[in-house]
């Protein structure tokens, strides 16, 4: 097999890159370890920045998102008996976010890829990357017991935190930055109307809570829990009781409860690896960085990586400017670190940390009061929440 760009991973970042490249006439093949149903079964993020919405539109996969996505012009933070709304649209110069589940984004991209006849190899086992620093890299993998080879010009590693792509870079070439948080999020998905038409983030003495949504009829709620908690110890009733205890009384009264479709506990971490490229291999999304979900940045950072890599590959193929690809990591990391900072900050001011003393607790409350009581502070949160601009590729 031969292609121009080999893409490892058929999650949203790999599929989005493949769709953009296909529209530009650049041949690509995606290799995915799992089945399509497994990929679609992952319950993930649902808040899309303006930049990602624009990129999906550019890729021609925005029809269902435009119809079913919920445009949010604000977000609310509750703390110390107060509720503060952040007017995202006004404070960011007209930008908004769109609530549209990652599963739906993935389904739209899968259907678009199938419709255009581009190649995706599912259940590709034992994937290995070779000759990354040479001019002719290639990928080997097994399918139905047969060992196959895929020759290519470039490889995009879009296979997530545990994927083979980052592992294919010599460890001594990479610098790892990491922070693991001492709690997780217990999330519940239910076919109940959302308690609010905008997201509510709550800082409460019992711990953080978030009221989110996937659609006008499907809600997603989270509560902060210790890492020692097990999801099987949480009945639906226990979850709803705990969630109500952490929300403002008037919100808790309106909360519609119901049976859970899914419950899971996700640990929180911040993680960045530098550089994000090695020879002709380029890492994108979770393969290179993880953010705690508090800032809704994980999927959106993957999209900005994909946008950067796509535009650099266009320059390489259309203008013969392959040397620009050497800038990929530096361009991506400038935006990534700002999103990492925002996600860390949101996590720090909204969660209750074990062993926090009275002074630190009062500082946390004052930090929220200052930012949410100041036009400049509100604008800073809004600018980051809707997403910082993508860097232009000259």
Swiss-Prot record:
Indicate the impact reported for residue 34 to T: Slight decrease of affinity for p-OHB and NADPH
Resulting phenotype, residue 116 to S:
Slight decrease of affinity for NADPH and p-OHB are observed
Effect caused by changing residue 38 to K: Slight decrease of affinity for p-OHB and strong decrease of affinity for NADPH
| Record SUPFAM superfamilies | FAD-linked reductases, C-terminal domain, FAD/NAD(P)-binding domain
Q: In this chain's numbering, which residues are marked as the site (Important for catalytic activity)?
A: 201, 385
Q: Identify the pathway.
A: Aromatic compound metabolism; benzoate degradation via hydroxylation; 3,4-dihydroxybenzoate from benzoate: step 2/2
Per the record, what are the reactions this protein catalyses?
4-hydroxybenzoate + NADPH + O2 + H(+) = 3,4-dihydroxybenzoate + NADP(+) + H2O
Keyword Iron listed? The answer is: no
- Per its database record, what is this protein's job? Catalyzes the incorporation of an atom of dioxygen into p-hydroxybenzoate (p-OHB) to form 3,4-dihydroxybenzoate (3,4DOHB). The reaction occurs in two parts: reduction of the flavin adenine dinucleotide (FAD) in the enzyme by reduced nicotinamide adenine dinucleotide phosphate (NADPH) in response to binding p-hydroxybenzoate to the enzyme and oxidation of reduced FAD with oxygen to form a hydroperoxide, which then oxygenates p-hydroxybenzoate.
- Family according to the record: Belongs to the aromatic-ring hydroxylase family.
Q: What is this protein called?
A: p-hydroxybenzoate hydroxylase
Annotated gene: pobA
């Amino acid at each position: 097999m031969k292609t121009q760009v080999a893409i490892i991973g058929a999650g949203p970042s790999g599929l989005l890159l493949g769709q953009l490249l296909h529209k530009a006439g650049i041949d690509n093949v995606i290799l995915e370890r799992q089945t399509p149903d497994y990929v679609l079964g992952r319950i993930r993020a649902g808040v899309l920045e303006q930049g990602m919405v624009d990129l999906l539109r550019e890729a021609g996969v925005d029809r269902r998102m435009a119809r079913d996505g919920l445009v949010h012009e604000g977000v609310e933070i509750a703390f110390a008996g107060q509720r503060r709304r952040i007017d995202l649209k006004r404070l960011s110069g007209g930008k908004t976010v769109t609530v549209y589940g990652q599963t739906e984004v993935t389904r739209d991209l899968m259907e678009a890829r199938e419709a255009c006849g581009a190649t995706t190899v599912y259940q590709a086992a034992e994937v290995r990357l070779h000759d990354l620093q040479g001019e002719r890299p290639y990928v080997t993998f097994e399918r139905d017991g047969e060992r196959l080879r895929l020759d290519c010009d470039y490889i995009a590693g879009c296979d997530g935190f545990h994927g083979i792509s980052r592992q294919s870079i010599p460890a001594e070439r990479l610098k790892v930055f990491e922070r693991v948080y001492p709690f997780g999020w217990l999330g519940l998905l239910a076919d109940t109307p959302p308690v609010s038409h905008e997201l509510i983030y709550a800082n409460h003495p019992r711990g953080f809570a978030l009221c989110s949504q996937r659609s006008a009829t499907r809600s997603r709620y989270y509560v902060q829990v210790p890492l020692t908690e097990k999801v099987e110890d949480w009945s639906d009733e226990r979850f709803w009781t705990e969630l109500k205890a952490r929300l403002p009384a008037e919100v808790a009264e309106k909360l519609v409860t119901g049976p859970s479709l899914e419950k899971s506990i996700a640990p929180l971490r911040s993680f960045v690896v530098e550089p994000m490229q090695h020879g002709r291999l380029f890492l994108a999304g979770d393969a290179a960085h993880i953010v705690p979900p508090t800032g809704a940045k994980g999927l959106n950072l993957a999209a900005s990586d994909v946008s950067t890599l796509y535009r650099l590959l266009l320059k390489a193929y259309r203008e013969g400017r392959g040397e620009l690809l050497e800038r990929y990591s530096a361009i991506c990391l400038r935006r990534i670190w700002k999103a990492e900072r925002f996600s860390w900050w949101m996590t720090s001011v909204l969660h209750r940390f074990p062993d926090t003393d009275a002074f630190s607790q009062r500082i946390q409350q004052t930090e929220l009061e200052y930012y949410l009581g100041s036009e400049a502070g509100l604008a800073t949160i809004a600018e980051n929440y809707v997403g910082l601009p993508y860097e232009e590729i000259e």
